[in-house]
């Protein structure tokens, strides 16, 4: 048999016509040794390439040999079957028989690929794909497949291909594999390995993974990262925030202080305040109390930073100095207002525009107009002061004193309730013990619903994320009164306090109250509150979400479950969650469920606008108006502050939608997307601004649309045109304040006062550099771009300027004769001066022409402008310089950050890259050079009317007493 096989293989043209040898395999009378020889011959690729289609017909016979326990060459038979299936391109079957062959398959080299190498690599590829699929399905993985994957992993680790193993671990959510790969890194950690750790961290943070899996991977990364000779402690503390390990973060700061690295410790403290919740920061401060402070001076600064004093002061300085609110625009909108709803909208919009600026000129200059506010409009008028004076905590009581309750509440308490909400907004996300105690006392002594309503909302926004059980219980007492209006605010406030800390007890309590109460306002408030409490919990919130969504006969609970699902997975980009939301859009009959499910896609994909566009594009043309509204808002959330042109193109047609609430949603969404955009970054923005004014001024437009247009104008210019609405913090992670603020803003569908909460999502577009003493030094930044690309939008023209009629100048006949005569005289004088002195001739003509002819012409002309000449004279010169300078603290919008550098890099060494923005602490490089500091923040203010570099006195406190409301 062996001789025949050799002759057959060596014949001219290679082996062919294998029928005779195939009969050997099929015949039960053939000797076993002959069958073994034939199998080995066919396993040679030189033979199989020409005969595999013939062998394919005999596969049943070969498979019978595999089932025969007495056959000695199972591996040869299995290998042959596997190769034939490979030729048939049935790769899963090829893998199955390769594994049954019980032989070691390892990847072949990439050089000189032959048939065998192609086969082996395809089997490996199929094995990995199968392993991934089974892992995601949670199905059992065959032991032989596990063994093969283990061999692949071991081989890659031996070759130091660590990232391949980590990627495979992420795709299969195999923590042991990731741990094995990271542990295999050398103790001295090269730059490449440190980069791998950073990539691992970015992958686990930005990926759609289970919370427990994420925490375990981050813990592994931290342990390995600490082995570095000089680890990035800022990155490590970022990990501690993600894993909610406040004690470790405190220990890190303490160790840096002990090593005399106080500047770096200050930077970490600033970053913690920006990204961590109040509850986390409280635990950090408690940890400090348990430690012995060696450097008390530095620790005092750390305490001040973590309590928010330094950040609030720096941002207040920035907003006041750079306030660029367009007062003319506000007056123009006011002139077009004819209804109470539009009046209410402008009060809210003014608060947003002047957020943090302490500039209440519009209210003080229009007291008669403001006094027209009644009932809840009066509530909002006073509450807007909380936005205007946000951060002015030291003088909060002085600002609000005229409106706070005295011995007895005047009227129905709308003014007092608004003042309490304003007090909470001034302390938003920063409710210290004094502020919370004050609000708690007001909450306890409140005598009517508007006062309790304002006290609850103020209490909740000041204590956002504190997870204080005692504060939660104080608000619960209001909920148990079973009042509609105060019950709504109590439900929201309970969720704000427990934001990110939902537990079984809280869920059961609020769910049961939703079922028991007859007030739909209270039910809606609890829905928003539970959604806020579920923020960021991901898999930990699944039991509560499934229980709520599973309430088949209760649409309020189902919509609550949808909101919780959106917030629990906000920013994760989980495709499974998006599919669940889309399923509810398609199948649930309730309109609230459909609307919130569509909006939820924007929350989940808030870090991935392009993916959100692909999911939501078709929904913008859905037959159901609530779905269209939800699609618009989803795009606004996911693309907030980006100026995304694709999103704008999808939303623009909805401005003319037949449904008024869809048109309103489209305007709000576009305002979110175009916030802080310029013609350079988004060519549509100026046209949209004109469209808003047109909507506000149209007499036949729906009042709901006008309300939305006015609020949209406030969003466009939020923070004096110095802030942007964004869903991420400085570390590009989902921001609790932003997500919670947006969820509360969406509650504005039912209750107008909730529009104030969008300010929680407004982040200052600033770059503030501080020295080691936490003072702001005088220094310049260089922006490597034309100054007009990132400039403020042009101011609106006043009505007086628009109404001026420009008439062509009338030139009398005698004037023409005089001008001609004067022209001849001037030319003669010019020739004489040129002959006398060449140098003076260069200057004399222009002097004579301007001083000799122009005044005479003006005397004879009528005092009006020439349209053509006026435009030429008044047109500003365009700045064509390729770069420009900015002064610290500077306004730097997100699109501008990558283009910023310090003018004198030898002066300061920042603790983090400038493109991160926000507050950056820097070490002085040249300490012998004299350091100049920026003047005190509150004492000098640039008003919108100021010109040049002169600085005016600060605005006087808005202390009118609106007793005639």
From Swiss-Prot:
It holds the Pfam family RPN2_C. Residues 836-889, 943-965 are annotated as: Disordered. GO terms for cellular component: cell cortex; cytoplasm; mitotic spindle; nuclear membrane; nucleus; plasma membrane; proteasome regulatory particle, base subcomplex; proteasome storage granule. Disulfide bonds: none annotated. One of its GO terms (biological process) is proteasome-mediated ubiquitin-dependent protein catabolic process. The keyword rRNA-binding does not apply. Keywords: Proteasome, Repeat. The keyword Cell inner membrane does not apply. Residues 863-882 have a biased composition (Basic and acidic residues). GO terms for molecular function: enzyme regulator activity; protein kinase C binding. PC repeats lie at residues 380-413, 418-452, 454-488, 489-523, 560-595, 630-664, 665-706, 708-738. Gene3D superfamilies: Leucine-rich Repeat Variant (1.25.10.10). It comes from the Eukaryota. Residues 836-856 have a biased composition (Low complexity). Acts as a regulatory subunit of the 26 proteasome which is involved in the ATP-dependent degradation of ubiquitinated proteins. PANTHER family: 26S PROTEASOME NON-ATPASE REGULATORY SUBUNIT, 26S PROTEASOME NON-ATPASE REGULATORY SUBUNIT 1. Belongs to the proteasome subunit S1 family. This is 26S proteasome non-ATPase regulatory subunit 1. It comes from Caenorhabditis elegans.
């Amino acid at each position: 048999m062996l001789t025949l096989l050799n002759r057959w293989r060596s014949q001219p043209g290679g082996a062919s016509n294998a029928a005779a040898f195939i009969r050997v395999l099929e015949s039960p009378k053939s000797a076993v040794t002959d069958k073994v020889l034939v199998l080995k011959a066919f396993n040679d690729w030189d033979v199989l390439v020409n005969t595999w289609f013939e062998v394919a017909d005999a596969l049943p016979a070969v498979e019978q040999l595999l089932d025969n326990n007495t056959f000695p060459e199972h591996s040869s038979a299995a290998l042959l079957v596997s190769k034939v299936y490979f030729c048939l391109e049935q790769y899963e079957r090829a893998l199955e028989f390769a594994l049954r062959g019980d032989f070691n398959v390892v990847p072949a080299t990439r050089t000189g690929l032959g048939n065998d190498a192609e086969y082996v690599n395809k089997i490996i590829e199929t094995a990995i794909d199968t392993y991934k699929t089974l892992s995601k399905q949670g199905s059992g993985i065959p032991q032989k497949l596990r063994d093969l994957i283990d061999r692949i992993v071991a081989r890659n680790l031996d070759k130091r291909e660590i990232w391949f193993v980590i990627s495979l671990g992420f795709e299969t959510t195999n923590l042991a594999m990731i741990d094995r790969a990271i542990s295999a890194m050398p103790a001295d950690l090269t730059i490449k390995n440190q980069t791998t750790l950073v990539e691992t961290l970015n992958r686990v943070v930005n990926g759609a993974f289970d919370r427990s899996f994420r925490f375990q991977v981050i813990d592994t990364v931290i342990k390995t990262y600490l082995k570095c000779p000089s680890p990035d402690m800022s990155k490590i503390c970022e990990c501690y925030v993600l894993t909610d390990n406040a004690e470790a973060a405190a220990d890190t700061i303490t160790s840096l202080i002990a090593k005399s690295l106080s500047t770096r410790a200050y930077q970490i403290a600033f970053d913690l305040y920006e990204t961590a919740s109040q509850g986390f920061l409280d635990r950090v401060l408690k940890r400090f109390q348990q430690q012995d402070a060696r450097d008390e001076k530095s620790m005092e600064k750390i305490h001040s930073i973590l309590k928010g004093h330094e950040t609030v002061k720096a941002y207040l300085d920035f907003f006041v100095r750079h306030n660029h609110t367009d007062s003319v625009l506000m007056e123009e909108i006011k002139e077009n207002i004819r209804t109470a709803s539009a009046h209410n909208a402008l009060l809210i919009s003014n608060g947003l525009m002047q957020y943090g600026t302490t500039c209440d000129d519009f209210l003080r200059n229009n007291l008669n107009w403001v006094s027209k506010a009644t009932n809840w409009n009066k509530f909002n008028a006073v509450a807007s002061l909380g936005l205007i004076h946000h951060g002015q905590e030291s003088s909060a009581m002085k600002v609000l004193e005229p409106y706070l309750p005295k011995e007895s509440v005047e009227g129905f308490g709308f003014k007092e309730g608004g003042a309490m909400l304003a007090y909470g907004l001034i302390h938003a996300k920063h409710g210290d013990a004094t502020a919370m105690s004050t609000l708690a006392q007001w909450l306890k002594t409140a005598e009517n619903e508007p006062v309790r309503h304002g006290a609850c909302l103020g209490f909740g926004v000041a204590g956002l994320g504190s997870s204080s059980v005692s504060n939660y219980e104080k608000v619960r007492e209001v909920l148990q009164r079973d009042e509609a209006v105060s019950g709504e605010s109590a439900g929201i406030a309970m969720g704000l306090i427990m934001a990110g800390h939902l537990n079984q007890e809280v869920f059961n309590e609020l769910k049961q109250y939703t079922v028991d109460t007859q007030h739909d306002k209270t039910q809606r408030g609890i829905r928003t509150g539970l959604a806020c409490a579920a923020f960021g919990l991901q898999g930990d919130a699944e039991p509560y979400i499934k229980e709520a969504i599973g309430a088949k006969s209760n649409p309020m609970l189902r919509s609550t479950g949808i909101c919780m699902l959106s917030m629990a997975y906000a920013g994760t980009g989980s495709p499974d969650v998006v599919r669940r939301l889309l399923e509810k859009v398609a199948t649930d009959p309730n309109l609230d469920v459909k609307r919130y499910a569509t909006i939820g896609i924007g929350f989940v994909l808030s870090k991935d606008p392009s993916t959100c566009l692909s999911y939501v594009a078709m929904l913008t043309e859905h037959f159901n108006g609530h779905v269209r509204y939800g699609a618009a808002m989803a795009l606004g959330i996911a693309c907030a502050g980006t100026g995304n042109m694709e999103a704008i193109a999808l939303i623009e047609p909805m401005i003319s939608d037949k449904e008024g609430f869809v048109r309103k949603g489209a305007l709000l969404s576009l305002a979110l997307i175009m916030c802080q955009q310029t013609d350079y970054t988004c060519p549509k923005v100026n046209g949209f601004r004109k469209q808003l004014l047109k909507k506000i001024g149209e007499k036949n437009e729906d009042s709901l649309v006008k309300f939305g247009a006015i609020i949209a104008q406030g969003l466009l210019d939020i923070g004096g045109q110095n802030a942007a609405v964004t869903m991420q913090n400085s570390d590009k992670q989902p921001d609790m304040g932003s997500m919670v603020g947006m969820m509360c803003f969406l509650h504005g569908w039912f209750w107008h006062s909730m529009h104030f909460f969008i300010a929680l999502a407004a982040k200052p577009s600033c770059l503030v550099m501080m020295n080691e003493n936490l003072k702001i030094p005088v220094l310049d930044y260089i922006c490597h771009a034309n100054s007009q690309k990132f400039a403020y939008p042009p101011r609106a023209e006043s009505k007086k300027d628009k109404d001026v009629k420009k008439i062509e100048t009338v030139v009398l006949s005698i004037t023409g004769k005089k001008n001609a005569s004067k022209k001849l005289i001037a030319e003669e004088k010019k020739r004489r001066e040129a002959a006398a002195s060449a140098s003076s001739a260069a200057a004399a003509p222009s002097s004579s022409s301007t001083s000799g002819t122009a005044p005479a012409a003006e005397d004879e002309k009528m005092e009006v402008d020439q349209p053509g000449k006026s435009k030429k004279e008044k047109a500003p010169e365009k700045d064509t310089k390729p770069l420009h300078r900015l002064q610290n603290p500077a306004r730097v919008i997100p699109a501008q950050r990558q283009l910023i550098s310090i003018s004198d890099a030898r002066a300061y060494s920042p603790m983090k890259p400038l493109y991160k923005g926000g507050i950056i602490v820097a070490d002085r490089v040249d300490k012998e050079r004299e350091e100049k500091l920026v003047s005190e923040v509150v004492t000098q203010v640039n008003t919108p009317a100021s010109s040049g570099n002169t600085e005016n006195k600060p605005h006087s406190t808005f202390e009118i007493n609106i007793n005639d409301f």
